[in-house]
């Protein structure tokens, strides 16, 4: 692809995630956490893929910016007609961007279902995790210093 065409596509995708062309001239260290997430999303959609992978898309963001990123993910995915696979520990994010959820525990899938059914999964591991309780079948090891 010609450099000019790639730059034009980059500016369009940056605009899709609410960033102006001036962001393209900045170094990564000059971007805020939210801007970095937006640039990452623009990069992910640049080739208009059929499948997009997200790894902790809202990690390190305050709840408001996390919600902004979730909205952008939902909008971009809808506009592209893409399928996504997201890995997250952020239940607010999972509830907003997912249609279906799978929970893994110790490398095994222990529950799969529609996000609308996660609160009534009947799975004690899922229940403990989504409610953020220390007590339950998931035991966290704490090592002495």
Residue ranges of predicted features:
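A short, surface-exposed alpha-helical micro-motif characterized by mixed small hydrophobic
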Residues: 94-96
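Conserved ABC ATPase signature
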Residues: 27-31, 35
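Helical segment within the ABC ATPase nucleotide-binding domain
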Residues: 67-80
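Conserved ABC ATPase "signature" region
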Residues: 5-22
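Conserved catalytic motifs of ABC-family nucleotide-binding domains
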Residues: 48
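Catalytic Walker B motif of ABC-type/P-loop ATPase nucleotide-binding domains
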Residues: 52-55
């Amino acid at each position: 692809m010609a450099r000019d065409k790639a730059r034009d596509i980059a500016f369009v995708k940056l605009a899709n995630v609410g960033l102006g062309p001036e962001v393209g001239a900045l170094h990564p260290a000059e971007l805020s956490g939210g801007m970095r997430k937006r640039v990452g999303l623009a990069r992910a959609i640049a080739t208009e893929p059929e499948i997009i992978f997200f790894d902790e898309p809202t990690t390190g963001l305050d709840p408001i910016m996390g919600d902004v990123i979730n909205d952008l993910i939902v909008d971009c995915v809808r506009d592209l007609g893409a399928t996504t696979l997201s890995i997250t520990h952020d239940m607010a994010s999972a509830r907003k961007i997912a249609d279906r959820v799978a929970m893994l525990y110790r490398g095994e899938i222990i529950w799969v279902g529609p996000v609308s059914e996660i609160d009534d999964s009947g799975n004690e591991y899922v229940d403990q995790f989504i409610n953020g309780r220390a007590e339950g079948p998931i035991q966290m090891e704490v090592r002495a210093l």
